Structure formats: structure tokens, C-alpha cells
């Protein structure tokens, strides 16, 4: 509220104001003259009450004395009674009756009549006169300090492991997971090197063939420039290693090199462990799967660490690769006659094409016109001969030009953009040698392509027949795209025979929309004839990192990914040649960076660096989550921020060369890339564009930190996180078994789909994808790599935990950025044992409580404080209103079928699930309502306009009158109810006679605030802020601590009242927590328990109402407008990404009169009363005091207007006064009309999308959804070396949670299955939990009934070649039934299937046989067609045995007698399902 306008209230009463100037002057004068009379009357009243009480007490004493004298007289006249005695029963009866009479007297005081009634009446009157307050403290939130592990790192000793073995184990972890026997073999080859200060560990011309691990001391790695100068690259300390993974590939492929520019020298006495790279060859010969896995890990590190750090953060693109690939083996082919001269001629005739040095300069697309033909075809031929000097050379390009010279222009114009020829030289239409525009023998082309790819893959001439069936040739025209960036389906190994290919990559600074435009792509390099491309995506198993287009008319030979993996099965060492091809393309810069960049694995609780340590490096978070904690001199720890995937940690301290200011530790298992300071300086000197990139990056960071500055939340031991939260992984944990976790996860998944790609994972999903033994320690690498890839592909991954502490639940806790604890709001708040175990597993992970309420309930959330007090580890809570289908008890079958249809619809962005989804992804929308007295009625109109514009509201903050209106919206969420309550409150504020009764002696304020408190308390009741549907905060001015206070919990009405306590009119509110005095928060920030208390505190106008005393600490609270009248910055700090701020405060007049150096009051009086002089504008004393009080508020308001995260709106309500509460409807209509027009204009301008659109996604279509099998983690060792892979058996699938239904888009883990399988019912039971059946979250996976003809039983089925090669035929249920199997008579029931499953688990031998047969079945799909029949024959006998085990016992079927309509309907559904099953069986 505004003090100035309140003092200048209109005297004519046209706006129904409460005060007028004349009345105020009269009252002030009467108080000044009659002050002594009031004092005298008060003294007389007090004396009268004391006299009355004294004489009444005296009368009671006299009556007691008379009774005593009468009793003594009776006793003295009775004679001697010493011989009389009472029986025990009479004594017990006497004392019992006496006790009952006492109890009756005590209990009678509770009623309105009886003894003590008059005394209570007098006390009530005295309490009303003297304003005595009864002690009635509401329930408070317990402020419990977080556990030490939450803010401290884990320090554990490693005494059990020798130091050398420990450092060895940590260092070779970059090569992947090694079993213990393999690790011991590698340790046998280690050597200990003793170095003194100044000794060289290695220098230039030394062989680069070892891994060095520093056991003690310090090693300096530096670069030697051509001019003899040196530049430090990095400092290697205890436990760190010096190696190049690229050199590792060179050594294994037989191309070992020497150190050319890198040297290492000991800075002090050091002990270094040396591990020769040749030691791995012995291990790889015995374990080829280990070799393949190591090469894959190296390629993944190259893509995720080197390219991520250098491209995304330093702006390097084309600088990472060479424009011309180095030849394989050597640059001059020794077997070719005159090879050196030929190479020189090739280099002389080849056009020099310089790749751009950075994404901005660098080379425009006009300089690289893709439609230009190759200027020198002979140069391409020479280059081809240079690479394959000893190969039978065929000048295909030149021969093609000669043969096609006679082709007319019209014929050339009708050419297709590309033509593909298969292994036999035939085009797809089946005609051989019919390529348009050429007469070259395609068989010769095919033979040359096979021979070229054979050499690139390192195969001998005898192995040509292995790759010949898979080599395809394709002719391309200019601008034809072979593969796009991010595509995982068309990954191939491309070999250029003629022409040139151009490789592009999207700009690192491009947004999601601009990345779709190819004009923003950056040219990386060209691929010339004789060069190969595509090996990186082939080895990593991930999507392509580049876009490849034809620059001119070209001919390429390629092998698809599936074919390469089949070739790897027979020749695993081709992975070395593919890796060597990738390494040969890299620039020397990447090799130097490979020595300096480190790939760090951190477990939960481990520190990256500690406070006050030297800052010599920065870190990039590849996966996981980090927490920054500062330790104050007093020992108190405070969270500074948290960092997620893609964030840069420690960059400012490294550049400024200051010590670490905080300690950064891992919240969960994390991967980081370490960028040393020396490497950064070396790149900076060589590529100055990096400095520009870094300045831009730091400028955005500092600008964001300036905009997000704010105060910390009140009352919390850990301050609010200033970093915008954005979670990548979310774990969902049920509190009790009756929590519908699966429907809840589906609903959340549905809402998240509107924001971006999301994935839901369960234990059964992972087992289906990776095998039933995937959670064992030996499969740690596969599991973590697969999960990391899923997290990279999706903006958020949902981990649905089991209801027990299973290995999958423990994995979820290790992977989660945040844990959502899901409970039922109407149930007991007690903490279960399982929930406590979850807290122990993830002590550092942030946990949030989600309380579910049925949509049919009319009650509002209550008792939330009890839930939070019982769980001190919870940092935030959410109230979620759920639709009816969530709480309906259904089988897993029907849940899946239900949500397969629900997920096809558009989610409701206004639902609580969508609000939770936006919070998890960092897209919350905040609404900030400013203060302004009666002008706050415009907030109601703006709320209606916001609702009609389709903008959801996820968080609400308010000051003064905005605190009142915002609290109403958070409590009701219905614009009609909010309008009605706001109108009733405004009408109460116009009743002047009630305000007159509230007048008091004006020492602190003019009014006592009692009636004002009553109006707010009647509006909200005893509601706490924690019980509101929407997260809410209010801001007050704490005059005890001289700062503003943010209230997110506690009494609602009290803090709303304190936020409206305008100075001079109401006393400050005394905070019950600490006793601080709180005023209107608008004094410091005019845009931002029991609910009404904080609303009352936020409306404590100084001078009008007394400050409100906080019931927690006793601080006095005043109106928040004195500090921040529009707290949009506070809302941003609390996590809102997009904010709408509505300002209804008054605007000061800035057009003041310049009166010179001095000012006379008499001159102002003359100007005021003389009608013939021009008026002057000079502020008076109240105006000056008001402007002084709002100095910080005005400054903060200007920052909010200039911020990029806030949409500042000010309705045209300046003509209305602060106390014009009688014009509520008129002001509301003004706000509504203005808001509607404002948002309509935003929609037309395209600026409304950031509030109601986040991700443009087409509505999902049935049967056209993504699948994990289409793009998933590829374990080359598993594929190539045929490692034992365990899959879920047929009977194990019974306990599978998720099945694949047609159109079921929420679980993209398997392919579409036969629809007839869905129609198979359970034997003897329906699909509802209302009947007696197994309580499980899984559905039946039953085999289809098939009848096998006797004539075909003895003949093995012939495999289909196309089916075998199809990538979608990997399911075992799509294979033909083995010949000796028998058809099933009927489907087994749940009980029998359960018994069969347990019997199989007890029989270890049978289980191993089943697993091996399942592996053979799967290998039939991916192996060469020639081995298909043999694998099928091997599988047949065991399948017959398995079917015999699955065959149920013959029992008569018992049908229940229907008693109700519901049971009759279920009976009909069951009968219909059985009829369909019989029909399918006959077919």
C-alpha cells in the first residue's frame, strides 16, 4: 500500500474512502486536547474493577469464618466420640462421594452457568479492554538441520588396497570394466620408475607406447613449440595418469608412433608406475570381447569428452579434424613405383580447401558451393592411387566422364539424385548395368568397392567373400544427403570412390528450432576419393554426430551397421582398423588435448575439489549432478548451487587464478571432463576465437547471476538454491504398497511428453532389454552405459522403483537427480521402514514429497505440516489432484490398455501433473502480484484474462494486496470463488463504523489492527501456507532485522496481514517465530504457517495498522511494499523460469519545481494561497518520507522491468486511490479488459508461446511410436563375441510388467506383438483385482496356440531370409514353433504358472538349458542367413521340453455364479475372450 496516497485520501468521499483530511485533522486535535481525560477515565475504571474484586473476596472470607464457627459449635456440644469408629467401606464411600463432588465442581466451570461464570465474564471484558492475548500457538514446522552427509563429502580410507594397485585400478578405469583375473594379468607388467626433480619421464622421439600413473610426487606435461619455447599443458599429481588413448589405438593396430611435441618432466622426487600398452595385446588375444569393449569406450570418450569440451565450450569445430585423412600406415606407399613423386603430384594438383577455423568466421557457404563439380578429376584419381598404391587401380571417374560425354542435356536432366547397386551389381529394380548416364560395368565397380573396403577394414584377400554380400554402391548427385546429424538408423561406413563428400555439423550455439535449418550448419571437412567416413558412429553405437552431403557427382561404397556387426563376429579385429581410421582423421590439436583432458568418474559423496585448494582446472559435467557448498568461518555450511549435465564448474576461479571458494561434491554417480588450465591457455594462444567464446559464456553467466540475486528463504537451515533447477533423472518411490505408482508414472509421463522426449524405465523394462542378469556386478558397464545413453537422448528419464529394496531400486537411487516420494494425502503421515531405507541410500539427493488426492474429494489439503515434520529430509512438497482412473484398482493388463489410449490424447497443461512436469524440467511459470491497496482488484481481472489466454500458473507470490489476492487463488483455483471472496473482503473495508471502533492511541499506529485481522482471518481461516494447492510465498519487511522476509510456510492470514501493515496506520506484525517486527514488504520489493497470519503481515501498513509480530521468532513484520513491491526476482530464485509480474502500485510525480539552492516555507505558503501565481510542485514532509521508504523498491522495480525472464504488466488504474475499496467491480473490469487485450496482442506477435508452449511435438499416432530397439546402446563385445546373454524366459515373462500393445507409446521398449496375444484371457479369472487373483504388477505373456500338422513335424522349418535380416525380428515369439512341440490345450492359470516358475528356479540345470536355447533363438535373427537353419535345428529339442513344462494339468473349469450386474458383465467379457481364443486356435 502507499503511505502518501493514504494520507491524501479524498475529502469528498466519491470513492468511498475511509478517511478524509477534515476528519483526520478534527480527530487529531481532539486527541491532543482530551488526552488527559482519557487517561483519567482509564485509571478510574481500573480502580473500580480492583475495588469490586477486593470486596467480593472479603465477603467470601467472612462467609468461610462463619461456617467454621458453626461447625466448631456443633462439635463441642456433641460430647466425647473417641470410642466411635467407621468401617472401611463407609470411609471409602464417604471419600468417593467427596471426590465426585469436587470433580463436578471443576467440570461445571466449563459451562456457561455455575460457579465461576461471573468471573469469566469479567475476564473476557478485561481482555477486550486491555487487549490481553491468550496463548494459542499453532503447529510449527520443525527446523531440522540436514544430515552431515548432505553438505559434506565422503572421506573413506583405502587401507585394504595397496596404493599402487588402487591408482592402477582408478587409471585403467578409462578403458572400461575389467574382471579381477584380467586386472591381475595387467599388474604383472607394471614397472616402478624412480624420478628425481628435473628428470624426464618421456621426451620427444621417445616411443609413445605406455600408460604412466603417478604414485607420488608431481609431473609436469608441456608442449614444445617449433621455436624452442615450451608451454605447460597440465600438472599430474598423485593418483593421476598420463596417457593418450589415441596412441593406444595406434599401438594395438601396429602403427606405434613417437612423442612429437609432448614432454613430461618431474617437478619433484616422484614415483611413477609404467604400464606398457603391449601388455593389453596378451589380454586381448585371450579375451577378444575385452578388446572390442576397450575400443568402444575409447571412441565414446573421444566423442563425449574431447568433442564436447572443445566444440560446445571452446567453439572449435573444423579445427578438430584434418581436411585430408592421413594415409593408412604411411604417407608414401612403398610398393608403388614412383609413389613419392605420385604423392607430390597429387598434392600439387589437388585444390587446397581450408576448413573454417570457427563457427562464426570462418568460411561462408558461398565459398563452399556444394553444386560445384570437382575441379580436377585427375587429382582424385591420383589420391585414390596414393591410398592404395598396390591395388589394381581403375580410373572410374575419368572413365565415366568419357562415356557420358555423349549424353544429351535432356537425358542428364532426367537423372535421379542417387542410384544404389547391390552386391551383384544390380539396381533395385532388378536390371543389371542400367545405371542412368553411365555404361561402366557395375560388376567392375562392385569388385573395386569390395577390394577397397576390405583394405580399409584390414582384411586379407581371402576375407573378401565375407564382406562381398554386404557391400553396396551408390551414385549421388550434388546436395544429396547421405545421413543427418542425430540419425541412428542410417549409420554406415562410407568409402568415397569418386567425387567429394562434405561433412557438416550444427552450430553449438544454435537453438532447437534453428538446428533444423541446414543453413546454420558449419562445414567441418571434405571426404575425398579413397577416404572413409562413419567409423565413429559405428564404434560408439550412437547416432551420427555429423551431416554428410555430396559436394559433387560422386560414387560411394558403403556397408550398413548391421552388416558390420556380422563381419565383426568373424573378424573382431576390424574394430582396430575402424578406430584407426577415425584417429587418422583427427588433427594434431586433438592428440595434444588427449594428453591433457581427463575423464573422471565420481561416486556419490566424492569431492571434485575442496575449498581453499588451488584452482588449476575446470570441469564439465557429462552426466550426474554436483553440489557446491561453502563453509563459513563459524563452521556453518551453505549450499551455493547445484550443477547438472552440461554445466561448467570452476571456470571463474581458474581464469582469475584464485583459490577455490567452495567445495564441489557429487550428489550421485557422475562423469566429468577435466580441462586443465595449461591446455586452456595453449588453445587460447593458438585459436584466439576461444577467448571470444569464453567471454560470451562468462557474460551470460554473470548476467544471469545478477538477475537472480535475492535473499534467502526465512527459517531454513539451508538457503535457497540460486541455480535454476533442471533435473535429468527422477526416481519415483511409493510410501506404501497401496500407492498407485504405475498410473501416477504414466500420468507424469503423459504430461512430460508435451515438453520434450521422455523415457519411463522399470526393472522389467531393463531386464527385457539387457537380460535378467543385468543388475549383477559383471554387467555394470553395460547397464551404466545404456542408462547414460538413454539420459542423453531424453530431457528427463523416469525411474519407477520397485516396492522393495531391490537392486533396481538401489540403482534408481544412484541414478536420480531428485527423488519423488509419492503418498496418499488422506492417509496417515507416518514414515515406513522402506522410506527410511531410501533416505539412507540417497542422503545427498534432493527429495520432494508428492501427496495425491482424488478428484472427487471436496476437501482441501490439510495436515501437510505433519507430513513434513515427520520427514525432515524433504525439501519441497507438491499437492496433486488426480483423476478417478488413477485410484481405480485394475490389473496391469487393463492399466496398460487404458493408458495406451490415454497417451494418444493431448495432456491438460493446467493439471497438477503438468505443473509438476514443468517444475522438474525447469519450465515453471510464476505469477507475481504487486501491492497497491484497492487497485489490487485489478489482479482479479488479470487472473481471469490469464486463465482465458491458456497460461498455466505454477507458482504465486504477492505483496500487500497482491498477497491477499494470490493466496485466494492458490487456495481456491476457481476464478468465481476468488472473485466472490475478494468482493466480500473489499466490502468489509468500506464499513467505516467498524474501523472507528478499532481506533487506538496513535503511539505505534492509528488502529489496533484487531478488526483488520478479523477480516483476513474470516477470509482464510486457520490455513497454513503448506496446505495451498499451488506453491505460494509472500514478502514482508522485517523491521527487527532490517531486511525483507520471504514466507513459504506458516500461518497464511498472519503473513498476509503483515505484508499489508503500512507504516503509521497499522502496527507491525510480530513474528511468532523470532519476535521480529514485520511491515509491508513493498518497502523493499513490491513484486514477490497458518495462512492468514502471513497475509495479514504482508498488509501491515505502517502507521495505519500495528506491525504484526511473527508467532515463530517474535520479529515485527510490516507491509512488503517497503522493500520489494513486485518480487519477480524472488520468484525467479525460487525456480520459476517464466514470470508474469503485475504492478498496481502508485507512481510518484517526477516533474518537480526547481526552486534553487534554498527554499522558504513562507514562499510555498504564498504560492499555495495566491490564485494569481503559477503553482509549484515541491514534496512535503510525508511525501519525502514516503519516497525515502521506497528508494530500494524503485531500484528493484527497474531491474525487474529490464530482465529477460519477466513479463512486466501495469494495468491503467492510476486514477483510483489506494483506499477506493468501494470501486472493486469497476477496477476489476479495467484489469480484465486490459489483460485480455494485452495477451491477445502477445499471441498475435508470437510472444505467448513461452508461457503455454515448450516443445513442438506432433500428436502421437497409434503404431508409430519410438522404440528403444530402434536406437539403443550397442555393446559390441556382446554382439561380436557371442557373450552369454540372458533373456527373460517365457515363464519369466509372466512377471514382466510392460507388454507391447499396438499404439502403446509410453513404453517404447519392444516392438508390436501379435494382436492375438492381447486377446488371450487368464484362465478362470477376469482382468480385475476385484476377484481373487495374484496381486502383481505384471501381465501374462502366453504362447499362442498353434496346431502343427503331423506331416510337417519331422521337417524343420525353413528360415525366411528377409525375416532373418530384419532388425525388427529379434523377438523370440516371432520365430517358428519348433517341430517337436505340441499345441497347448488351454492357458495355465496364475497359480500354476507361479508354481512352474518356482520349480524352474530351483532346477539350475534346466534354467541354464533354457537360457542357452533362448540365446540361440536370438542369434538366428542377427546371424548370417546360412546359419539360421542350423540354429533353428539346435533349438527345437529343448523347445519341446519347455512346452512340456509349460503344459498345465487338466482340471475342470469352474465358473462362478453371477450374483450382481458387475459380475455378470465380467462373465460375459470372459466368455467373449474365450471365444476369440478358440477362433485363433482354429486359425
Curated annotation (Swiss-Prot):
PROSITE patterns: CNMP_BINDING_3, PNPLA, UPF0028
UniProt domain PNPLA: residue ranges: 927-1093
List of residues that carry Phosphoserine: 418, 424, 1174
Catalyzed reactions: a 1-acyl-sn-glycero-3-phosphocholine + H2O = sn-glycerol 3-phosphocholine + a fatty acid + H(+)
Stretches with biased composition (Basic and acidic residues): 1382-1396, 1445-1458
Residue intervals on the Cytoplasmic side: 56-1483
UniProt keyword list: Developmental protein, Endoplasmic reticulum, Hydrolase, Lipid degradation, Lipid metabolism, Membrane, Neurogenesis, Phosphoprotein, Transmembrane, Transmembrane helix
Comp. bias (Low complexity): 1410-1419, 1465-1474
Transmembrane segments: 35-55
Binding positions (a nucleoside 3',5'-cyclic phosphate 3): 574-701
Motif placement: GXGXXG: 931-936
Enzyme class, first EC level, given as a word: hydrolase
Residues bound to a nucleoside 3',5'-cyclic phosphate 1: 174-301
Gene Ontology MF terms in the entry: lysophospholipase activity; protein kinase A catalytic subunit binding
Any single biological process term in GO: neuron apoptotic process
Subunit structure: Interacts with Pka-C3; interaction inhibits the catalytic function of Pka-C3 and the esterase activity of sws.
Recorded family membership: Belongs to the NTE family.
Protein name (record): Neuropathy target esterase sws
Native source species: Drosophila virilis
Organism lineage: Eukaryota, Metazoa, Ecdysozoa, Arthropoda, Hexapoda
Gene this protein is translated from: sws
Amino acid at each position: 500500500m502507499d503511505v502518501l496516497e493514504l494520507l491524501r485520501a479524498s475529502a469528498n468521499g466519491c470513492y468511498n474512502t475511509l478517511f478524509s483530511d477534515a476528519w483526520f485533522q478534527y480527530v487529531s486535535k481532539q486527541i491532543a486536547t482530551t488526552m488527559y481525560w482519557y487517561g483519567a477515565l482509564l485509571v478510574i475504571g481500573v480502580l473500580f474493577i480492583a475495588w469490586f474484586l477486593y470486596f467480593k473476596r472479603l465477603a467470601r472470607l467472612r462467609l468461610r469464618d462463619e461456617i467454621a464457627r458453626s461447625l466448631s459449635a456443633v462439635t463441642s456440644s456433641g460430647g466425647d466420640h473417641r470410642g466411635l469408629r467407621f468401617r472401611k467401606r463407609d470411609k471409602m464411600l464417604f471419600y468417593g462421594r467427596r471426590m465426585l463432588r469436587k470433580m463436578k465442581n471443576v467440570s461445571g466451570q466449563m459451562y456457561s452457568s455455575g460457579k465461576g461464570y461471573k468471573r469469566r465474564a469479567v475476564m473476557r471484558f478485561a481482555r477486550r479492554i486491555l487487549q490481553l492475548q491468550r496463548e494459542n500457538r499453532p503447529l510449527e514446522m520443525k527446523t531440522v538441520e540436514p544430515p552431515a552427509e548432505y553438505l559434506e563429502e565422503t572421506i573413506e580410507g583405502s587401507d585394504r588396497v595397496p596404493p599402487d594397485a588402487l591408482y592402477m585400478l582408478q587409471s585403467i578405469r578409462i578403458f572400461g570394466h575389467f574382471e579381477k583375473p584380467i586386472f591381475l594379468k595387467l599388474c604383472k607388467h607394471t614397472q616402478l620408475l624412480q624420478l628425481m626433480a628435473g628428470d624426464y619421464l618421456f621426451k620427444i622421439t621417445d616411443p609413445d607406447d605406455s600408460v604412466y600413473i603417478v604414485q607420488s610426487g608431481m609431473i609436469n606435461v608441456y608442449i614444445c613449440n617449433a621455436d624452442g619455447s615450451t608451454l605447460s599443458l597440465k600438472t599430474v599429481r598423485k593418483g593421476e595418469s598420463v596417457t593418450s588413448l589415441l596412441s593406444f589405438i595406434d599401438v594395438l593396430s601396429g602403427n606405434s608412433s613417437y612423442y612429437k611435441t609432448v614432454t613430461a618432466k618431474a617437478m619433484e622426487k616422484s614415483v611413477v608406475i609404467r604400464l606398457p600398452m603391449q601388455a593389453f595385446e596378451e589380454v586381448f588375444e585371450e579375451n577378444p570381447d575385452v578388446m572390442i569393449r576397450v575400443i568402444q569406450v575409447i571412441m565414446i570418450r573421444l566423442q563425449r569428452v574431447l568433442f564436447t569440451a572443445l566444440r560446445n565450450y571452446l567453439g572449435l569445430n573444423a579445427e578438430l579434424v584434418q581436411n585430408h585423412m592421413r594415409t593408412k600406415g604411411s604417407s608414401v606407399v612403398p610398393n608403388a613405383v614412383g609413389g613419392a613423386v605420385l604423392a607430390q603430384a597429387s598434392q600439387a594438383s589437388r585444390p587446397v580447401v581450408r576448413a573454417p577455423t570457427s563457427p562464426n568466421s570462418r568460411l561462408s557457404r558461398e565459398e563452399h558451393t556444394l553444386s560445384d563439380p570437382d575441379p580436377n578429376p585427375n587429382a582424385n584419381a591420383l589420391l585414390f592411387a596414393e591410398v592404395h598404391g598396390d591395388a589394381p587401380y581403375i580410373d572410374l571417374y575419368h572413365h565415366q566422364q568419357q562415356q557420358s560425354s555423349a549424353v544429351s542435356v535432356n537425358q542428364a536432366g532426367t537423372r535421379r539424385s542417387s542410384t544404389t547397386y547391390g552386391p551383384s551389381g544390380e539396381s533395385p529394380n532388378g536390371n543389371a548395368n542400367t545405371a542412368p548416364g553411365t555404361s561402366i560395368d557395375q560388376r567392375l565397380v562392385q569388385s573395386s568397392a569390395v577390394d577397397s573396403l576390405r583394405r580399409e577394414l584390414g582384411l586379407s584377400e581371402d576375407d573378401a567373400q565375407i564382406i562381398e554380400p554386404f557391400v553396396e554402391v551408390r551414385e549421388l548427385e550434388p546436395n544429396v544427403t547421405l545421413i543427418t546429424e542425430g540419425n541412428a538408423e542410417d549409420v554406415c561406413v562410407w568409402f568415397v570412390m569418386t567425387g567429394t563428400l562434405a561433412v557438416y555439423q550444427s552450430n553449438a550455439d544454435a537453438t532447437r528450432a534453428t538446428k533444423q535449418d541446414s543453413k546454420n550448419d558449419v562445414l567441418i571437412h571434405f571426404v575425398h576419393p579413397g577416404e572413409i567416413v562413419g567409423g565413429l558412429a559405428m564404434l560408439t553405437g550412437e547416432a551420427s554426430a555429423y551431416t554428410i552431403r555430396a559436394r559433387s557427382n560422386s560414387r560411394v561404397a558403403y556397408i550398413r551397421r548391421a552388416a558390420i556387426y556380422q563381419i565383426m563376429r568373424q573378424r573382431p579385429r576390424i574394430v582396430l582398423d575402424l578406430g584407426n581410421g577415425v584417429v587418422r582423421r583427427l588433427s594434431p590439436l586433438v592428440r595434444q588435448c588427449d594428453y591433457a583432458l581427463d575423464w573422471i568418474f565420481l561416486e556419490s559423496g566424492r569431492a571434485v575439489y575442496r575449498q581453499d585448494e588451488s584452482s588449476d582446472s575446470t570441469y564439465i559435467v557429462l552426466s550426474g549432478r554436483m553440489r557446491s557448498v561453502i563453509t563459513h568461518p563459524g563452521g556453518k555450511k551453505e549450499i551455493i548451487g547445484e550443477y547438472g549435465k552440461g554445466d561448467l564448474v570452476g571456470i571463474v576461479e581458474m581464469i582469475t587464478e584464485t583459490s577455490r571458494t567452495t567445495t564441489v561434491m557429487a550428489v550421485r554417480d557422475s562423469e566429468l571432463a577435466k580441462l586443465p588450465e595449461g591446455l586452456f591457455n595453449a588453445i587460447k594462444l593458438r585459436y584466439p576465437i576461444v577467448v571470444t567464446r569464453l567471454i560470451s559464456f562468462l557474460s551470460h553467466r554473470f548476467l544471469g547471476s545478477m538477475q537472480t540475486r535475492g535473499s534467502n528463504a526465512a527459517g531454513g537451515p539451508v538457503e535457497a538454491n540460486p541455480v535454476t533447477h533442471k533435473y535429468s533423472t527422477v526416481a519415483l518411490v511409493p510410501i506404501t504398497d497401496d500407492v498407485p505408482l504405475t498410473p501416477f508414472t504414466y500420468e507424469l509421463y503423459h504430461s512430460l511428453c508435451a515438453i520434450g522426449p521422455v523415457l519411463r524405465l522399470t526393472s522389467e523394462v531393463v531386464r527385457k532389454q539387457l537380460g535378467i542378469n543385468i543388475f549383477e556386478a559383471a554387467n555394470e558397464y553395460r547397464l551404466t552405459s545404456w542408462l547414460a545413453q538413454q539420459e542423453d537422448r531424453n530431457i528427463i528419464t523416469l525411474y519407477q522403483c520397485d516396492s522393495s529394496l531391490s537392486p533396481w531400486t538401489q540403482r534408481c537411487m544412484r541414478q536420480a537427480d531428485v527423488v519423488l516420494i509419492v503418498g496418499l494425502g488422506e492417509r496417515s503421515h507416518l514414515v515406513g521402514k522402506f522410506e527410511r531405507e531410501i533416505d539412507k541410500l540417497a542422503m545427498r539427493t534432493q527429495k520432494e514429497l508428492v501427496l495425491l488426492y482424488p478428484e472427487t474429494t471436496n476437501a482441501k489439503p490439510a495436515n501437510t505440516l505433519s507430513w513434513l515434520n515427520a520427514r525432515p529430509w524433504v525439501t519441497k512438497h507438491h499437492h496433486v489432484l488426480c483423476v478417478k482412473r488413477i485410484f481405480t484398482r485394475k490389473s496391469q493388463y487393463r492399466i496398460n490398455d487404458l493408458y495406451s489410449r490415454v497417451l494418444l490424447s493431448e495432456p491438460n497443461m493446467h493439471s497438477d501433473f503438468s505443473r509438476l512436469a514443468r517444475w522438474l524440467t525447469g519450465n515453471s511459470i510464476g505469477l507475481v502480484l504487486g501491492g497497491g491497496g484497492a487497485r489490487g482488484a485489478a489482479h482479479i481481472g488479470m487472473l481471469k484474462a490469464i486463465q482465458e489466454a491458456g497460461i498455466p500458473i505454477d507458482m504465486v507470490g504477492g505483496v500487500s494486496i497482491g498477497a491477499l489476492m494470490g493466496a485466494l487463488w492458490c487456495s481456491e483455483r476457481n476464478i468465481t470463488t476468488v472473485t466472490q471472496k475478494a468482493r466480500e473482503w473489499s466490502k468489509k473495508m468500506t464499513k467505516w463504523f467498524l474501523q472507528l471502533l478499532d481506533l487506538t492511541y496513535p503511539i505505534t499506529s492509528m488502529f489496533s489492527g484487531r478488526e483488520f485481522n478479523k477480516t483476513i482471518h474470516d477470509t482464510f481461516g486457520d490455513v497454513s501456507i503448506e496446505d495451498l494447492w499451488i506453491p505460494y510465498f509472500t514478502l514482508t519487511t522485517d523491521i527487527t532485522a532490517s531486511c525483507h522476509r520471504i514466507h513459504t510456510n506458516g500461518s497464511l492470514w498472519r503473513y498476509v496481514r503483515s505484508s499489508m501493515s503500512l507504516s503509521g496506520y497499522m502496527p507491525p506484525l510480530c513474528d511468532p517465530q523470532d519476535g521480529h517486527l514485520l511491515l509491508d514488504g513493498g518497502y523493499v520489493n513490491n513484486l514477490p504457517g497458518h495462512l492468514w497470519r502471513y497475509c495479514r503481515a504482508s498488509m501491515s501498513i505502517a502507521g495505519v495498522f500495528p506491525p504484526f509480530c511473527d508467532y515463530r521468532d517474535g520479529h515485527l513484520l510490516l507491509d512488503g511494499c517497503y522493500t520489494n513491491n513486485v518480487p519477480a526476482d524472488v520468484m525467479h530464485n525460487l525456480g520459476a523460469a517464466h514470470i508474469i509480474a503485475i504492478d498496481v502500485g502508485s507512481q510518484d510525480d517526477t516533474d518537480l519545481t526547481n526552486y534553487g539552492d534554498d527554499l522558504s516555507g513562507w514562499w510555498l505558503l504564498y504560492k499555495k494561497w495566491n490564485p494569481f501565481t503559477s503553482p509549484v510542485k515541491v514534496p512535503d514532509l510525508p511525501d519525502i518520507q514516503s519516497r525515502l521508504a521506497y528508494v530500494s523498491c524503485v531500484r528493484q522495480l527497474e531491474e525487474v522491468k529490464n530482465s529477460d525472464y519477466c513479463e512486466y504488466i501495469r494495468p491503467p488504474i492510476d486514477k483510483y486511490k489506494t483506499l477506493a475499496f468501494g470501486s472493486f467491480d469497476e477496477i476489476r473490469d479495467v484489469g480484465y479488459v486490459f489483460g485480455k487485450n494485452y495477451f491477445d496482442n502477445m499471441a498475435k506477435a508470437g510472444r505467448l508461446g513461452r508461457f503455454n508452449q515448450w516443445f513442438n511435438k506432433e500428436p502421437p499416432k497409434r503404431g508409430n511410436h519410438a522404440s528403444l530397439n530402434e536406437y539403443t546402446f550397442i555393446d559390441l563385445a556382446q554382439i561380436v563375441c557371442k557373450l552369454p546373454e540372458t533373456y527373460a524366459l517365457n515363464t519369466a515373462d509372466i512377471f514382466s510388467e510392460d507388454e507391447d500393445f499396438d499404439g502403446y507409446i509410453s513404453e517404447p521398449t519392444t516392438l508390436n506383438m501379435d494382436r492375438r496375444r492381447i486377446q488371450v484371457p487368464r484362465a478362470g479369472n477376469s482382468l480385475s483385482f476385484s476377484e481373487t487373483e495374484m496381486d502383481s504388477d505384471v501381465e501374462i505373456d502366453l504362447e499362442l496356440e498353434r496346431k502343427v500338422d503331423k506331416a510337417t513335424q519331422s521337417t524343420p522349418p525353413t528360415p525366411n531370409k528377409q525375416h532373418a535380416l530384419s532388425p525388427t525380428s529379434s523377438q523370440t515369439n516371432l520365430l517358428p514353433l519348433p517341430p517337436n512341440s505340441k499345441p497347448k490345450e488351454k492357458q495355465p492359470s496364475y497359480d500354476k504358472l507361479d508354481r512352474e516358475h518356482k520349480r524352474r528356479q530351483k532346477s539350475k540345470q534346466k534354467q541354464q538349458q533354457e537360457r542357452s536355447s533362448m540365446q540361440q533363438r536370438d542369434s538366428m535373427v542377427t546371424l548370417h542367413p546360412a546359419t539360421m537353419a542350423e540354429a533353428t535345428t539346435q533349438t527345437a529339442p529343448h523347445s519341446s521340453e519347455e512346452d512340456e513344462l509349460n503344459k498345465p494339468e487338466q482340471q475342470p473349469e469352474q465358473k462362478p455364479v453371477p450374483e450382481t450386474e458387475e459380475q455378470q458383465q465380467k462373465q460375459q467379457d470372459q466368455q467373449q475372450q474365450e471365444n476369440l481364443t478358440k477362433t485363433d486356435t482354429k486359425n
